[in-house]
Structure formats: structure tokens, C-alpha cells
A protein has these predicted regions:
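Aromatic-lined, polymer-binding surfaces characteristic
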Residues: 1-94, 105-132
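Short, mixed-charge aromatic SLiMs
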Residues: 2-4, 43-51, 95-107, 152-166, ...
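Active-site-proximal structural scaffolding
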Residues: 13, 64, 97, 124-127, ...
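Hydrophobic packing residues in well-ordered alpha-helices of helical domains and bundles
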Residues: 35, 90-97, 146-153
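Terminal, non-catalytic domain-edge segments
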Residues: 133-223
Length: 223
């Protein structure tokens, strides 16, 4: 389907690239054109300081974390593994990913709140996918300790899981903090809510990893 439907000039390009990268990883074959085109356009859309535009324009939302940066680094990792031309951009994108994760850690207030910015806020703390992914990759900046990320993300989850978050059958309701269906965008459904689970990426770390075993640390805004 991704080959029949032309993606719009936005983060959608990365979905086509990701599907082709998955085919390359699992079958050894793919159409490289969507991959190279998505990379070309996002290089052009980079705005600086770890932020990409969602298309040509800058949008103040969390799509750098929901889609753009995590999927770019994953596509580039597959390209690097399979020695695809253009994979050398991996190192550049990795530094941008780490920079954005650094900023995300600083967005978390002492109370565990964070700015409600732009669309798709019904994905709740999935907004911290980049911070979670960089933690899982064990590539946090030196001045950010894994334990402070653990404590910060835990505080966010405890703060945000308000009454009304789940329905009577245990499914996530639409909302940001509790049940707020009016916050849902037209493309959001109950299934979309589960993008919030990307905050759990550090669960991929071993049980004896420093992320889990180190003593609690204050995160930046608490310090």
C-alpha cells in the first residue's frame, strides 16, 4: 500500500522509508527510492538545534519525538547495516537525536508536568519517545544520568495517569490527563492512544542495567 499511495510532503515520507527499510532488513530487498527521498527532504527541513520541520514549515509539537527522529535513526541504522549509500548520515542524525533528548529531559517540571504543544497530545507521554529511546540506546549526554531519566519519566507517568484514563474494561480513553475526548484529532482513535507505550522503551534494558539499579537522581528542573 505504501508503494501505491503517494505520501504527503511531511513526516509521512518516513513511514514509506521505514516500510522499505523493514523489507530490506527482513528480505534483503527493497525499493531504495522512498528511503533516499525521505532522507533528502528531511535534510532540507532541518531547522537547527535538534529540530526538524514537519514538512517545509516548523511546527511546535512533539512530532520530532513521535515519528521523525526515532524513525530516521532506525532507517539509517538499517542502511548502515546493509551498506546502503547515504548511511553515513547516521552519525549526524544520532547527534541530533541526542540533542533533542537532552532538551526533552529539561522539559519535565519538578512536578512531572510538561508543555502541551501542538497536535496529537492524546498520545500522552509517548511524547518522550526520543528520551526513552536514547536511554535504551545508552547514549544519553554525559551530564544526564540514566537514573534521573528513570525518575523523571516515572514522575510524568504517575502525574498523568489521572482518574478517567482507562474505561471500565481497562482500555485507554481518549485524552491527555484523564478522559478528554475533545482533545482528540480527527485521525486519532482508541488504538492511537497506545503510542504512549513508547515511554517504556527502557524496558529493553537488562534488569541489572544502571538505568534500573542506580539510586534515584534529581532531574534537571529539580536541580
Amino acid at each position: 500500500a505504501s508503494r501505491r499511495i503517494k505520501a504527503s510532503e511531511s513526516n509521512w515520507l518516513i513511514f514509506s522509508a521505514t516500510i522499505e527499510a523493514a523489507l530490506l532488513e527482513f528480505t534483503g530487498e527493497c525499493d531504495l527510492k522512498p528511503i533516499h527521498y525521505a532522507l533528502k527532504r528531511h535534510k532540507e527541513w532541518y531547522k537547527g538545534d535538534g529540530w526538524y520541520g514537519d514538512g517545509r514549515n516548523f511546527h511546535l509539537d512533539y512530532y520530532n519525538s513521535y515519528v521523525i527522529q526515532p524513525m530516521l535513526i532506525d532507517v539509517l541504522a538499517v542502511m548502515k547495516e546493509h551498506k546502503v549509500e547515504g548511511a553515513d548520515f547516521y552519525d549526524v542524525q544520532l547527534q541530533r537525536l541526542i540533542r533533542y533528548a537532552d532538551q526533552q529531559e529539561k522539559m519535565i517540571s519538578p512536578e512531572g508536568t510538561y508543555p502541551v504543544l501542538g497536535r496529537s497530545m492524546g498520545y500522552r507521554f509517548g511524547a518522550f519517545q526520543v528520551l526513552a529511546q536514547v536511554s535504551w540506546m545508552k547514549l544519553l549526554p554525559e551530564h544526564i544520568k540514566p537514573a534521573q531519566v528513570r525518575c523523571a519519566l516515572t514522575k510524568v507517568m504517575k502525574r498523568q495517569l489521572a482518574k478517567g484514563t482507562f474505561d471500565k474494561d481497562g482500555w485507554l480513553n481518549l485524552g491527555f490527563c484523564g478522559h478528554q475526548p475533545e482533545i482528540a484529532d480527527r485521525y486519532v482513535s482508541t488504538g492511537s492512544n497506545y503510542l504512549c507505550t513508547f515511554i517504556f522503551l527502557p524496558l529493553g534494558l537488562q534488569a541489572d542495567d544502571e538505568f534500573w539499579t542506580a539510586k534515584p537522581e534529581k532531574w534537571s528542573s529539580v536541580k
